[in-house]
Amino acid sequence: MINPLLRPLLTEKSTGLTEKKGQYVFVVKPDADKTDIKKAVEKKFGVEVKSIRTINCLGKSRAQNTRKGRVTGKKSDWKKAIITLEKGQSIDYYSNTAQKSEG
């Protein structure tokens, strides 16, 4: 698979995971598996991945009333990956580089 990583997911909860546990959250392609995600993270950021958890998120249903009646639709399903790195490693989302701390 060609680069399953779409973008980092920056929310209050994901930022808390990064600060407290050193876990990073990415939105990935729905058909990506853990081995593809691991290879992509290690190649792009130059870090060692300890573990990966993936979550399939269902898109929300939407409805709108119009002159012709009720129109329903659905947002796309998506997938996120929570990535835990080895001790002493971190990812800087903005510079696309990894940093290793001494110790």
Swiss-Prot record:
Disulfide bonds: none annotated. GO terms for biological process: translation. Keywords: Ribonucleoprotein, Ribosomal protein, RNA-binding, rRNA-binding. One of its GO terms (cellular component) is ribosome. InterPro entries: Nucleotide-bd_a/b_plait_sf, Ribosomal_uL23-like, Ribosomal_uL23/eL15/eS24_sf. The keyword Cell membrane does not apply. It holds the Pfam family Ribosomal_L23. GO terms for molecular function: rRNA binding; structural constituent of ribosome. The keyword rRNA-binding applies. NCBIfam families: PRK05738.1-3, PRK05738.2-4. Part of the 50S ribosomal subunit. Contacts protein L29, and trigger factor when it is bound to the ribosome. One of the early assembly proteins it binds 23S rRNA. One of the proteins that surrounds the polypeptide exit tunnel on the outside of the ribosome. Forms the main docking site for trigger factor binding to the ribosome. Belongs to the universal ribosomal protein uL23 family. This is Large ribosomal subunit protein uL23. It comes from Pelodictyon phaeoclathratiforme (strain DSM 5477 / BU-1).
